[in-house]
Amino acid sequence: LVGSEMCIRDSYRSAFIITDIDADGNDEALAFYTLSSQSSTQNVRVSVLDKTEDGGWDAMYELAGSGTYVDTVMLADYGSTVDILIGYGSPASEDKSVCIYRYTSGVLASIYEGAYTVIGRWDLDGCGADETVIVRKVGTSVSVSTIKTLDGLDYQTRERNLSVSASYISGCCYGELYDGVNALFIDAVTENATAFTEIVMLDGDTIVSPTSDSSGLLERTARPYGYRTMDYDGDGDVEIPVISPFLGYSALTQSDIENITLWLSYDPELRDFYEEAQSYYNVSGGYIFKLPGRWHNFVTVQRNADTNEITFLKYDYTAQSISEMEGLLSIAVLPTASEQAYENNGYVYIDGTDYVCFMYKSIASESEPLLLTADEVRSNLYYIES
């Protein structure tokens, strides 16, 4: 095959995928390429290759894909059959296209074609097997579809519209909603840059969305875009962030407000959200600091925009300004090259990457009841990958 180098934009990154795609016990290769002599607007080509006895590869089948690049490739192995899901994209279109192929008798045949904004395979009904889940935005309307099969023979397809009106889908997160029940959390952003989260799961043959099915529940998830739904602490439960001004900031203008992040979980009996945790969420700095319980209603913050440093303060309603309040703890995000300089100034390393590190400095007196131990600081700070 003569072609130009390609990159697949998801789990499978190579332009070649070697695996058993027809359940015959032998590996085949899927090759994705474009012809060097053609324009950049041509559709990507997909080729199936079989291994020869001498270790080489022979092209067995070829077709044109439904886009100029491959967005994602997923395989669904049902034992006797394998579904090949290929998502295609094109710079000229907001929509992406998915084709589900089956390779049998030397032919790569399409058994499903559709459009998507986000696609994935997740177990939404707790059956132990993943369903294909398609989230699609058309205009400002958002819908979700599921394609379910346990054997690759009988397929059930379901679709429903969601309540949210969106300019774009900013992300999807899969995880536990409550008591072993998993769901898909869809973050959608409106034209005024407000983010909402829709929750979707399967109950039997029905797509259920607590946020769309209960009046006022979707509105409870409103916050500025950039605050992502996530399992921030790695416990398997997904929480939704909403914000409220820290103590002492309610009378200030919006641009000057420092917000506390309240993490919401869902209670199926109440059919409502409850507050699971409070934190300071530094979106630009890439970290979350969970507030210990004894800090609730007693602490506020002050941010140094020049140094990207946050100082937690003991709230004093009699103080004339935030800056007059007693400091408890400072957290700084800095380039790794500056670590030694901060260490010389009394800061202690908490966490970091190859490029940035997180350090803290305790500035409260030893007798202060709100003073945190080193272990408390470390266990409550979470680095958030972008």
Which residue ranges define each predicted feature?
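Short, small-residue-biased leader/transition segments that mark boundaries at the very start
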Residues: L1-I8
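Beta-strand-rich domains and repeat architectures in extracellular enzymes and scaffolds
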Residues: R9-S36
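Beta-propeller blade termini
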Residues: R13-I21, T68-Y78, V82-D83, Y116-L124, ...
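Acidic/hydrophobic-patterned starts of short beta strands in beta-sheet-rich repeat architectures
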Residues: A23-Y33, D77-Y88, G126-V135, Y178-A188, ...
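Structural motif
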Residues: Q38-S47, A92-I100, T140-T149, N192-D203, ...
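Beta-propeller fold detector
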Residues: D58-A64, A109-A115, Q156-S163, S209-S215, ...
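Solenoidal tandem-repeat scaffolds enriched in leucines and small polar residues
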Residues: R102-T194, V200
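N-terminal targeting sequences that direct proteins away from the cytosol to non-cytosolic compartments
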Residues: G175-Y178, N192-F196, T206-Y317, T336-S386
